[in-house]
């Protein structure tokens, strides 16, 4: 047993080794005499074999060496949330009860929580007893156990109450780490990296080299720590040595010890917000990068050091950004709470601060801190580094002169790395660009064993030992982010790679944008020369699968080089390694960016291979076979593209700037920017062979450049564009030769046009360029922050360019995604700040909780399913709702082949038809990829090719919708269809054969019920549209803000209660389907059950599969079937899917990642009532739900006493991060169900097991009885109102839901009388307002809805905090009446409004909301209509019809609303115009029958209704429907409850 001892404060009390339990016991018993030894640990550690061995050895040795002494053990609950006053007190009470005295020795065996808290217990118990620290986590070994800091947490922050109390010993037994989960292991490495970063550069280098082996071992299924035992012990030892040395110099943290807090100022603040989901080390890792960036921002730390630190942390699996993908998975929606102000407040109360002044440790280089102390930093600088959005303040007083050295050229850096990796020997590469691009390149080269890569000069020099082109596969995907250069160069390099045991191919992939960028011409050229390359996603773009071992044949290679010169350079650099010498011929016209091709040839020469240009063939190169010979040193020239930004700064501000290492001899085309662009625009340019100086004219005096061809320097066009924006003169500035910029990180030409417009600068695209119409600098507009400022498009050059124009505005300009500049110039913002003295601020955008889910765009939707399942009809509805075009692929095939399908099959057979069908499918999926609904033939899934295309479409974000219906109905339909070939087998057999394929090929599934009436058909359309809204993200389910209830359907077959569903769902805001209780859980049965619900209830569905262990019937062991059922729920478009917190992590992650727009309810149920609500396990379950990003957390306990319900209420108050459904079961738990707010489960006497939950009536009555509801009065006001049916409607609803409310009539013509008698009373609940008070009542409304403001009238008033809210529900009454009558909620058809009164305004608003392209207005007097038109926005597209001729010319109208008095005859002239418009709309239009709504509900049938229906065959809707539908919405506003629609409808209609 080898033990290393580390001195601290003059004593060798820190012992480090592997498997040293015996040593710990002997050392303590021999040297720390005591009557009582107490080992304190947590319940997790107590279950480990290492802990058992320690305690057993202690007991054995104690009985032998000190038989008079005793050993006590005590366990606390695990976790940071138990490191508090209460737990400390419990430990102290135990010690007192056991009669422990001042000679007690306490052993703290555990992680940092145990060490900190039990150390504090020892510091205060009996005024201080001896303590021994036995850390069992890596973090505790290297950090918390060393130095004597002890503490507990408080609600205000971590470690705010504690003491310095040095342990007698610290025993770091590395074998304890065998029990550590991988995440905890990785967590500890943050502190290890930290100590090396602040103190020991040599150890930091060792850690860089150890990372891969470390991560491989600790993340394996069965970690073998013995295999890295020596390195692990050294890792702990070296880190402990640093901390021990610092503590010995500064025990009480008066100065030097503050250095150990590097990364902790920001890290602790993040941790305080994200604990316990985020671990200490993870937060410190992010904090280190942010504090390193702060050092760089202040001009102290070189950019290379930040890049090196970041790379090292990432190599250990640690996050370096709050928005790290894996880190976000862990913290979930808590990310929302990481706000600048909150972090700054947390930092302001950090213990190492001087008062409220925030102090940070600043790095000077790896291994050394700046001035060996913490420094005061400004909140403004902290805000900047903490955000990815930046406010650029006006350039008020920039320095007159500046010298700027840009980073190394990205182009040269990437080429140098390829050449060095392919070469023989060692080369020291200096001034390499340390950016995202080169990081990806370095990682890829290392992964392919192309070279051994190390660093010197604190990371400034990259040492590359090339392997002479002997590369082999690694078995790992090579992820290249958005690094276009790396992707193109590595594609050819990958063709040279040999096979290894790890893999037979190389896969290159990147981020979403990278997978859109073109690489086709290069792949084509390589493919023709022997490479085997497969596109894994989109044709012509990454990801690519490149077969290893083929190499390049050599000989003549033809390549199209008009899009990217990088294709050329890629082949040029790899050509010497082909089997034969290469002749590279560039075809298709003049190559783009010739200077970059010349650069590549020049660099190849530096590495020993000379390219010769053909003397007989234009754009052709000869490359000999050979191997590169690496020079001893290669210095990368600074990036000329990057140099354009500081030079442009000088041009735009009238100052001077020098780039000392780029001149006329540069290899880079962009080096000519100053001479060819800035000089003609009025700048003074001085350029030597090695330097460039630009002096701008006085501010505002730049001249436009009528035309400049920037083909030799295309990347610089963005810089030129922002300079041209403020160059006002006699002409515009035209830049051409830059067509390739459309396929860079974004479409840069389009981006510049779009963003320049935000500054008020007109610009337009040219075929191969851009034209900018410069404006006076004083006329620049400041882009609106409320509209998200300036987008960078995740493009470094866009961000840097607009940072220049931003500073010329009069107000600060917001630029998004500033970190994108890390691609080529990570320190650009630091240069602006420290060199150009520009004021920058961080900016935090408002948080959007759904931002991780993008609403579906205009991507086409493919519809599949059996013939006769309604594909054509539902596809038409789908197209109508989305505004898409409809394409029947069977018809398209028939038109293409010039024959009918039936004839085709008869002539050539089914197999031929399936082949043609697959060809057409591929063509349609590509040709009609946007804005279409593609309805396929029923048998498309029969062909393997077609199936693969469908699967690929779904896998890549497209919707493939499977439609199905009852098979008996399908058979009936098909029997009558003679237009299609008959099946050779029965429908049932065909279905059984295809069923699996339909499910495999689709990602969504809709089961449509049989409809036998028009009402059922209309209801089906509403249900289908609601389904489409959800799966496309047009509408996401909203978690109710107030009280809400969900009726739990426990029937094994809903068809048994189908006739009672209307009654059963009264008062429910959702329906919970207990799928585990169904008599059959096959996909078809479950889909049919959901169809039953959708047919009879317009309510969101909560889809629950409860397992046996959680109180349900579904077998826990059937995990795969459970997963399939949950995924089926998502496919079926349910609003909420219930996901048990007890499910395997893999299942939770898969459902969470595939949920689409469905919300997730994370549920845990303690069916046996074992947990009290003050037990930490409930908190852990809640945190688990939050961590997995559940939209709602549901926790169900069991009450054994009334106190259990009160404890639950206390729990709810403390846990508010996510909406919480929490209640107790059992007879004693009813109170908790009444007090629950969100989706309280309710039952009904008609359901099985109805006694478990209350009915809606019982729930509301009990809530009223305990004071939850107060009795309220509601009124309809106006005159005359004696016949108003509003009281009937509302009171019927109150009665059905058992609400303690009354609705009455109050006749009034004066709103002040209403205020005094109704509004000003304590029991006032709300008003329904009719004429003549809809305008007058508005003076009492302190807040208005958008509808009320636009319509200009209020018909609903409710009390809100501090005043009253006014709304207008008339428009809802109109739109919902249409929708319930079968009209789609969105339609691009035209509308007609007859009349010019108040209701007409509501009708116009409603038709606009329903998507009407144009709304015609007809009235007896046109003057009133003109006033009406003026009061609405222009985009309403209102048109007055004054004459019969205008009526004749009107487009077809599908929707009409009559808002004229029904008790008077129609005006003759008005009638003529109406008739002409009605006659023009009589044809079926927009997928539904033209429909007229009568706004008057008396008489039941009005003259215009009679005329419209009988003469013109329109569908008509009586006015009573509008009354019911507006009352339905009004009821919700008044009470917060969903009205029982059928009941309120009967109360009005059957009066």
UniProtKB/Swiss-Prot annotation:
Ranges for region Shikimate dehydrogenase: 1271-1551
Pathway(s) this gene product operates in, as recorded in its UniProt entry: Metabolic intermediate biosynthesis; chorismate biosynthesis; chorismate from D-erythrose 4-phosphate and phosphoenolpyruvate: step 2/7; Metabolic intermediate biosynthesis; chorismate biosynthesis; chorismate from D-erythrose 4-phosphate and phosphoenolpyruvate: step 3/7; Metabolic intermediate biosynthesis; chorismate biosynthesis; chorismate from D-erythrose 4-phosphate and phosphoenolpyruvate: step 4/7; Metabolic intermediate biosynthesis; chorismate biosynthesis; chorismate from D-erythrose 4-phosphate and phosphoenolpyruvate: step 5/7
Binding-site residues, NAD(+): 42-44, 80-83, 111-113, 116, 136-137, 158, 176-179, 187
Catalytic activity: 7-phospho-2-dehydro-3-deoxy-D-arabino-heptonate = 3-dehydroquinate + phosphate; 3-dehydroquinate = 3-dehydroshikimate + H2O; shikimate + NADP(+) = 3-dehydroshikimate + NADPH + H(+); shikimate + ATP = 3-phosphoshikimate + ADP + H(+)
Keywords: Amino-acid biosynthesis, Aromatic amino acid biosynthesis, ATP-binding, Cytoplasm, Kinase, Lyase, Metal-binding, Multifunctional enzyme, NADP, Nucleotide-binding, Oxidoreductase, Transferase, Zinc
Residues holding Zn(2+): 191, 264, 280
Cofactor note: Binds 2 Zn(2+) ions per subunit.
Disulfide pattern: none
Ranges where the record places region 3-dehydroquinase: 1049-1258
Shikimate kinase as annotated region, ranges: 858-1048
UniProt superkingdom: Eukaryota
Main location: cytoplasm
Cofactor(s) this protein cannot do without: Zn(2+)
Binding site for ATP: 865-872
EC number per UniProt: 4.2.3.4, 2.5.1.19, 2.7.1.71, 4.2.1.10
One GO cellular component term noted in the UniProt record for this chain: cytoplasm
Residue stretches in coiled coil: none
Annotated region described as 3-dehydroquinate synthase, given as residue ranges: 1-379
Residues where 7-phospho-2-dehydro-3-deoxy-D-arabino-heptonate binds: 127, 143, 149, 159, 191-194, 243, 257-261, 264, 280, 351
Catalytic residues (positions): 253 (proton acceptor), 268 (proton acceptor), 1194 (schiff-base intermediate with substrate)
GO biological process: amino acid biosynthetic process; aromatic amino acid family biosynthetic process; chorismate biosynthetic process
Region (EPSP synthase): 392-838
Cited HAMAP family: EPSP_synth, Pentafunct_AroM, Shikimate_kinase
Similarity field: In the N-terminal section; belongs to the sugar phosphate cyclases superfamily. Dehydroquinate synthase family. In the 2nd section; belongs to the EPSP synthase family.
Function as written in the Swiss-Prot or TrEMBL entry: The AROM polypeptide catalyzes 5 consecutive enzymatic reactions in prechorismate polyaromatic amino acid biosynthesis.
Annotated protein name in UniProt: Pentafunctional AROM polypeptide
Organism classification: Eukaryota, Fungi, Dikarya, Ascomycota, Saccharomycotina
Gene that produces this protein: ARO1
